[in-house]
């Protein structure tokens, strides 16, 4: 009888332990990519770490591998300096943790700096002792993502990080650390490419192989980029998500800003600014990307249609990477757009609107186009310059590049008078804040009479319906932040009426001067109008045939006419389902049907000698792939901001039930 009772108690104890054991099985931890910086995101990071405490201690590890210059070796001097620099971040993180503790809480903070900078460090068994089961969060610092992941990839340390994350540990990463939070990782721009070259084939080095990648458990359905608007990285992210065998969605996290990724659902933007989502999958923008050769000495440039553009600010809007849907609104199954405003009145002369030519006037394709239509008597109008001398210097540069004698005037407050016999007018400017819009009004009759007009740089935006009268982006960091990032807050960009020759809004130097915030502000406040961002050395030529891109780079068209709009808790712009197109030189600016079930016409992907770890497959130029209705992505149903469940795992409790049954049976047999 006694043995039967013991058997029964043992069986009951195991069965009662099953629910507790199952509850102890944690979901994977959150991912917190932070675009750059520390101070403005420490508060939220500390709160997440405290909420994830595994006991009485909030245990945080600081991983500073991105500080290394080489993931295979390090000098003692560099190690000492790295430890010293990272210790400052450890102290700051500890302070954030302390401030996040609830009042009266018995929790304590334990923040440790990992002495791991190389592969050798990550294979040292002694360093595994830091990775205890109670770790709440690992915080990966900024620096170089190549060495950041390179120091731990395929090592016992990475394996242990994988285990801890699978059991609920949070991974936060800033700057390079954020880049590591997507499995497919942008390593850098390729050698010889600058930020202005992001749209050119071969510009981006992408790591997507077993030995070169981001964290294995990182975001699977998107590629993360950081410093996004601060460094105008939209071109390189578009480039990355258009590559074969790469997720066709990009997440661009701005500096001093973070976001939560929970099982591929993005939510709870924290910090100061915005997070962009570029969806090149829903309407097959990545599959239909075109590679256009504009210069035999340069790689082809990439042309995009129907990228879905989302913007998230702090607030309640979420984005599901699995379904590619925003909680604010779903994308339409089809979208048939018209760009009827990209036309000029019948009988008007050609109009060229360019994004800044002054640094490359010699052999400028845009200026050469103007020369072919301008005739012999060009009149240069300078406006928006700080002084007459500054205007004269600029006029001379354009005059020399034109290679002919011209008449010119520096406009202050008086309306211009066009000299008799003028065949074309070139309007140039430096500072949109100082452009004298009213003084240019007399130009319209001249243009409507069939005469060519060109406007460059700061003079160009005033020819749209509205423009942003601001100075160029300043060099000092505080004012630069105000111009490039705070412009994503409502009311931080001044907007004034333009001349209205073309019923759009315009912004020059869109990448070179980091003006996406200004363009977004124009688009958000006038969503009925197309918003055009024009790169340096690039222009739109309007004539009787329509609008055509000329020059050396791309033009961004933001279309918010069917987008859903909302302001975040910081008055930041929140946008769902805007449309983004990139037109390149030689192309007419005409939209294409956006259809989730449209056939895909894939162009050959140019292959260049790059540092990519594995060659990417390409299709022959003549290949045409047709997707049937069943193969096309379904129209997303309306979704709530829910957390996706993890893939089902083998129920471990079944083993315990079986074991209990066996033990009970054996004991009963022995009793008999």
Question: Predicted segment positions?
Answer:
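C-terminal and late-domain segments of enzyme folds
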Residues: 25-56, 62-75, 81-82, 185-187, ...
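Catalytic nucleophile loop
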Residues: 140-142, 160, 164-185, 447-467
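C-terminal membrane-anchoring or membrane-association module
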Residues: 654-672
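Bacterial N-terminal signal peptides
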Residues: 8-19
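Bacterial N-terminal signal peptides that target proteins for export
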Residues: 1-9
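Glycine/threonine-rich flexible loop motifs
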Residues: 145-154, 432-439
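Juxtamembrane/start-of-transmembrane alpha-helix segments at the extracytoplasmic/lumenal side
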Residues: 642-657
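A short, well-structured beta->alpha microelement
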Residues: 108-126, 401-417
């Amino acid at each position: 009888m006694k043995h039967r009772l013991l058997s029964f108690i043992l069986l009951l104890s195991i069965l009662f332990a099953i629910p507790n054991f199952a509850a102890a099985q944690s979901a994977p931890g959150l991912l917190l990519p932070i675009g750059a910086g520390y101070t403005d995101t420490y508060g939220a990071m500390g709160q997440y770490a405290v909420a994830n405490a595994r006991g009485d201690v909030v245990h945080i590890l600081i991983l500073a591998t991105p500080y290394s210059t080489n993931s295979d070796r390090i000098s003692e001097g560099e190690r000492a300096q790295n430890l010293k620099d990272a210790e400052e971040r450890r102290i700051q993180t500890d302070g954030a943790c302390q401030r996040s503790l609830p009042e009266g809480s018995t929790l304590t903070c334990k923040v440790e700096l990992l002495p791991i900078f190389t592969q050798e460090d990550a294979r040292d068994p002694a360093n595994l002792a830091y990775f205890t089961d109670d770790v709440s969060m690992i915080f990966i610092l900024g620096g170089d993502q190549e060495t950041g992941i390179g120091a731990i990839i395929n090592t016992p340390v990475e394996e242990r990080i994988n285990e801890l994350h699978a059991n609920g540990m949070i991974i936060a990463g800033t700057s390079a650390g954020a880049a590591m939070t997507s499995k497919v990782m942008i390593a850098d721009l390729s050698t010889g490419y600058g930020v202005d070259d992001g749209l050119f084939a071969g510009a981006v080095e992408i790591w997507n192989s077993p030995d070169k990648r981001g964290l294995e458990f990182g975001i699977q359905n998107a590629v993360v980029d950081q410093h996004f608007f601060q460094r105008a990285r939209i071109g390189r992210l578009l480039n990355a998500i258009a590559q074969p065998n790469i997720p066709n969605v990009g997440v661009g996290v701005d500096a001093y800003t973070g976001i939560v990724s929970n099982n591929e659902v993005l939510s709870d933007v924290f910090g100061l600014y915005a997070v962009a989502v570029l969806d090149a999958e829903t309407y097959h923008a990545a599959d239909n990307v075109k590679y256009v050769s504009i210069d035999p000495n340069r790689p082809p440039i990439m042309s995009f249609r129907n990228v879905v553009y989302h913007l998230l600010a702090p607030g309640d809007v979420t984005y599901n990477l699995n379904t590619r849907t925003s909680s604010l609104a779903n994308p339409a199954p089809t979208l048939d757009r018209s760009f009827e405003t990209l036309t000029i009145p019948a009988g008007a002369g050609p109009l060229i609107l360019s994004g800044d030519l002054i640094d490359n006037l010699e052999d400028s394709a845009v200026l050469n186009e103007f020369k072919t239509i301008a005739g012999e008597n060009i009149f240069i109008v300078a406006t928006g310059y700080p002084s007459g001398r500054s205007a004269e210097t600029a006029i001379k540069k354009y005059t020399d590049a034109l290679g002919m004698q011209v008449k010119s005037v520096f406009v202050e407050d008086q309306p211009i008078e066009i000299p008799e016999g003028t065949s074309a007018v070139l309007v140039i400017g430096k500072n949109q804040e100082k452009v004298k819009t009213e003084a240019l009004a007399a130009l319209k009759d001249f243009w409507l009479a069939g005469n060519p007009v060109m406007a460059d740089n700061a003079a160009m935006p005033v020819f749209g319906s509205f423009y942003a009268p601001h100075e160029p982006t300043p060099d000092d960091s505080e004012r630069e932040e105000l111009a490039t990032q705070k412009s994503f807050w409502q009311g931080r960009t001044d907007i004034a009426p333009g001349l209205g020759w073309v019923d759009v809004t315009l912004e020059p130097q869109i990448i070179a001067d980091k003006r996406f915030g200004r363009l977004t502000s124009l688009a958000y406040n006038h969503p009925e109008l197309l918003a055009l961002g024009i790169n340096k050395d690039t222009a739109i030529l309007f004539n009787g045939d329509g609008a055509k891109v000329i020059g050396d780079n791309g033009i961004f068209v933001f279309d918010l006419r069917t987008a859903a709009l909302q302001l975040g808790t910081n008055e930041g712009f929140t946008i769902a389902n805007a449309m983004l197109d990139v037109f390149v030189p030689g192309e007419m600016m005409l939209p294409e049907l956006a259809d989730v079930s449209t056939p895909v016409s894939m162009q050959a992907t140019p292959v260049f000698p790059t540092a990519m770890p594995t060659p990417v497959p390409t299709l022959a130029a003549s290949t045409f792939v047709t997707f049937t209705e069943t193969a096309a992505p379904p129209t997303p149903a309306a979704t709530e901001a829910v957390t996706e469940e993890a893939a089902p795992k083998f129920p471990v409790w079944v083993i315990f039930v079986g074991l209990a049954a066996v033990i009970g049976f054996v004991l009963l047999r022995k009793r008999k």
